[in-house]
Every structure is written in C-alpha cells, then in structure tokens.
Amino acid sequence: MDAIDFVKKNTEEIVTMDEAFKALNNNPKGYIGFEPSGNPHLGTCLLLANKINDMVNAGIKMTVLLADWHAMVNDKLNGDLNEIRKSGELFKRAWLAAGLNSNVKFVWASELVEKSDYWSLLLKVAKNASLLRIRRSLPIMGRSEEDADRDFSKYIYPLMQVTDIFYLDVDFALGGMDQRHAHMLARDIAERMNIKKPVSVHTPLLSSLKGSGRMDSFKKMSKSEPDSAIFMTDSNDDIKRKIKNAYCPMKEVNGNPVIDILKYIIFPYYNDKISIKRPESKGGPVDVDMDSLTRMYISGEIHPVDLKNAVGELLCDIIGPVREKLTGD
C-alpha cells in the first residue's frame, strides 16, 4: 500500500486530500487527542490503535496527547486529575497490549500547560476566534451552550484543542467524526494566523450495540452504557452475550453495529479474510472478505445468527490477550 492508502484506510473524511499528499512528502507529524475516562472498549482501544498504526505505516510520526486537563474541564471522573491520570495509564496499557506501534509518543496535556509559551499561543488563538465559532465547537466535548454558560472553562476547551495542534506543530490531526468542529476551527484559525493548516483525518464512530431507534440519531458505543459496548475487560461469556443481543437486522448493513465491528475491528486484524460457519443446508462454512461478506449478507446467504456466532468467537480471540495483559485473567 502507498502512504496515502494507509491514511485513507477506514476513514470517513480527509480534509484535504491534496494537502495530505503534500504533507506526506515532508517528514510529517501527526497527533490524536484523547480524554482519559472510564474503561477501554472496541472503539476507544482497538479501532483507535488500528488507525494510529495506519498513520505510522504511512510514515507519520504520531503523538497521542493524553488530555488530562481537558478531561478535568469536561468534568470526567468528577474532574479528579489523579483519577483521570490513572485512567490514562490504563488506556496506554490497553493500546500497547492491542498492538499499538511502540514508536508512538505519549504526551500529557499537563506537560504542555506547565509551559508559559503554551498559554501565550492560546491567547493568540483566542484573538483569532469569535465567541460564536467557539459555541459551535462545543459538541466536540459533548456539551451544550447552556453547559458552557454555567461553567466558562468549557469555552476554553476548544481553544486548548486548537492550541494543542499548533503547539505540537503537527501536519495531521486524527480524530473521530465527533472532533470535526475542532479540526475545522484549527484550520480556520491557522489560515488567519498564516501558519500551516492541519490535515484533518476523521474516522467513523462505532455505533452502539443496541442500534438506534427509527426516530433516534446515531448512538455510539458508550462506557456509561455497559451493554452498548464491548470492553477490553469483558469475559468471553460477556462478549458472546452482548453480540448475541446486538442489533443486527437481516439483509441490512447500514447502521448495523455487528457489520461495523467486522469492518473496522475484525477484518483489519485478520488481514481481510475470515471464515463463517453455516449449517450444511445453508451452504456450509464460507471464507469471506469484507466485500463478499457484504454481498452475501444483503442477499440473505449469511444469516444474522451465523454472523453473530462468528463475530463473538473472533472477538474473544482478539480481546483475550489484551484482557490478560490488563487484568491477568
């Protein structure tokens, strides 16, 4: 694969592709900011580690910013920095156990905010941002304007995220689609400040195992809803139970969390080839890649029960070694 193919792999959007091509030719640096909180799940551990590795394989020097101060501002773990840092250390162990490239650098936000030039840069960023634009960026932290009006520190959060990007001097800003507002804000402010704009690489978010109701908007895996996500500490029985109960409509791949897990977690792990057991009356075992699986599922050749059985077993194989390193079980 070419470098750009690694960057594009399993992404929702790249802003912009032309800038990405150019940046890849100049010893690029990249970063992803992460708020430590709770326990690692498929999305915050495996999907994230896979995508960071893609960026490393593209020749990008990647940094993970463990955003402890951001998590404190966002009231994660009751704003307790000690607990937030414990969570950050847990995520570091989980990512490395999941195969994160050992050359990836970890930096704590607390290391940055101790430096006076960080805050002078933040003020320059603020001078080039309007209150209206900051308000529009609040969804990056899952907050509303009303939340920020009650706690002004939340207006500082988007400014910190932009400052992180500039302070680390990165060419690529990686994040889920929920971080798009912050990355677009950084690009706009960079243009006003006449400095390089970060290429924004956005990944999909893993949907809740429960799916979304007909009138509901997208729901992602959430640590606050244990049955909506597969956690790295889940037992094999829990993994299989959650997958068995997961939303998986017959012949539908869009909005199907089981299909998403296959696409973003399982196929990358198994080099795009797995085997699915079916009753002999339904054709027997079949080897598939993502394209053939999609066709066969839509046509009804693969039943949801057989799909779930395969996904449950494969996830147990993937998560088992990670769980053992985290818990000893």
Curated annotation (Swiss-Prot):
It comes from the Archaea. Gene3D superfamilies: HUPs, Tyrosyl-Transfer RNA Synthetase. A motif ('KMSKS' region) lies at residues 220-224. SUPFAM superfamilies: Nucleotidylyl transferase (SSF52374). The keyword Cytoplasm applies. GO terms for biological process: tyrosyl-tRNA aminoacylation. ATP binds at residue 223. The keyword Plastid does not apply. L-tyrosine binds at residues 31, 157, 161, 164, 179. Belongs to the class-I aminoacyl-tRNA synthetase family. TyrS type 4 subfamily. PANTHER family: TYROSINE--TRNA LIGASE, CYTOPLASMIC, TYROSINE-TRNA LIGASE. This is Tyrosine--tRNA ligase. The gene is tyrS.
